[in-house]
Amino acid sequence: MTLYAILFCIALLIGMAVSVYAFGTGSKRAKIFKEIYYSIEEVDGIGVIYTKTSEYSATLRFKNPCQKYCANIDGYYEYAHLMTALAQTLGEGYAMHKQDVFTRKGFSEDDGQQRESLSDAYFRYFNGREYTDGYTYLTITQENKKSKLMSYDPKKWNNFLSKLRKVKDRLRDAGIEAKWLDKQEATDLVDRYFTLNFSDKVFSMNNLKVDDERINMGDKWAKVYSLIDIDSATVPGLIRPYTDIEVNNTSMPVDMMSIVDSIPDAETVVFNQMIYIPNQKKELSRLETKKNRHSSMPSPSNLIAVEDIKRVQDVIARENKQLVYTHYNLVVACKKDVDPQKPTNHIENVFSRIGIHISKKAYNQLELFVNSFPGNCYAMSDEYDRFLTLGDAAACLMYKERLQQSEDTPLKIYYTDRQGVPVAIDITGKEGANKLTDNSNFFCLGPSGSGKSFHMNSVVRQLHEANTDVVMVDTGTSYEGLCEYLGGESIPYTEE
């Protein structure tokens, strides 16, 4: 009898295993990643992403125009106006999904160049030092009206390709060099977002364990912070593209969202910024309906709501502004041993300083993470994940800065940046891709013992390694030994 019972249990377990293998567990979460993409194909050098809900998407890679700590107020406004112009260019039925990625990595200078011993020693000193690197992607998505029957519309497809060309032309006219990701690059971006690994050349995927607070993946965990709670829109009534910080008792303008690139203990941060362009007439009609509903029930809160709606209607009528739906979230990945409360407290504190209170209701962690995949932004719930605002305000909440990186120039002089890693700078200002002057003369001034000779020896050595002729004029004989070592000619000044 015991043998029959054991055989029965074994048969039952085998049957359950076969059932799960064949039909799945019935859980939507188990299949959620299979329901995102249909395929990624290359069209005229552009990697076009097709979702299973029949949306088309393509992704641009570029660098934000404002360098960090540039204190360029005009640059912040120009970039915000550019994003607003892109939304107006795309028009109804399109979405912009901008992703700014920040990842911690170890410094490694492996360009394969042959260097002298001093230069090799210089780079060996910095090898392995951690710093933050940044990447910017902009995904353009065409919405597909949800229906049970999916069909190909050549008119919509041609309109999509036309909009892609217009977006790139608009960026080029603004002085931003952008490149469409091809099929391989788009696939790599999707895979790296899934693993939240943007630093390693070779990476692997792990199983996910999800709860209401975070997503566990391998040796790290990730948490999605939704910036705006639509039930209590705790954002400033008036915003601008920058904010002021105090530096040595002096006010300095920085990007309003500059706080997202310096979250403590974070290995990877992805700042998702989504803008959806709806039908303007329908949204204005809904606003009018809301205004009438509020005005029909007199109360202080309803009167304030009526005044706000009237103000928005006036701005739209006078300045031809655009209404958009937006969603912003931060995906923060940390190592397993990091206390989740530490980055959470930091994010809540820094955003509260600019009048934004992080949503406390982001319990749908997996859905927020999946809906932030490139090209999948229309999966965001239009009931509780998006909020309505003006296009200008939405652009102000976008990240506009880029981290310090080496200049594109054949004449590289290395200095360390604020993170303590070497970056190449063309101190002449005339050899790089961005030419600032046609005069390569420069002057080094400082009191005795301030390090002029140490600095100039390093600069001249690097110029010499770049096969550059150097003429130096010095009040003393500090560089006589250097001149002799490099085989140059020293001409001392005499009264005769």
Predicted feature descriptions by range:
Residues 393-398, 403-420:
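Pre-P-loop entry segment of helicase/translocase ATPase cores
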